[in-house]
């Protein structure tokens, strides 16, 4: 990934909005799906090229993308678990809780859902693959991302 820090955005007809990525020190710090990009967002970045290809149907799990997860440890653990859900598959919030070290699915359902909703980098931390809980991406975006992946 490019080491260029900044905000990058490109419009997606499939999502009917922009995909906006913020990068610092070679790591993704945020991903959002605004209807209008930040005024200083630039349209050219290798990650945006990959996202466009992905949205066009080219499989990409984005496993090599480094994401800066600056969240409390328990939320970070949940999001790190979500990163292990493979391209083209889905999981439930209960399954994510079961797979996350230190989480008890019967007691921590709320914690898992809060972590998913606080995801700073949807797509690269694929909360859209958790089919019964909302991530931080708009619901319509999550549905379209699952459709792209055939799940």
What are these regions (language model features)?
Residues 4, 61-151:
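Nucleic acid-binding interface residues in structured DNA/RNA-binding domains
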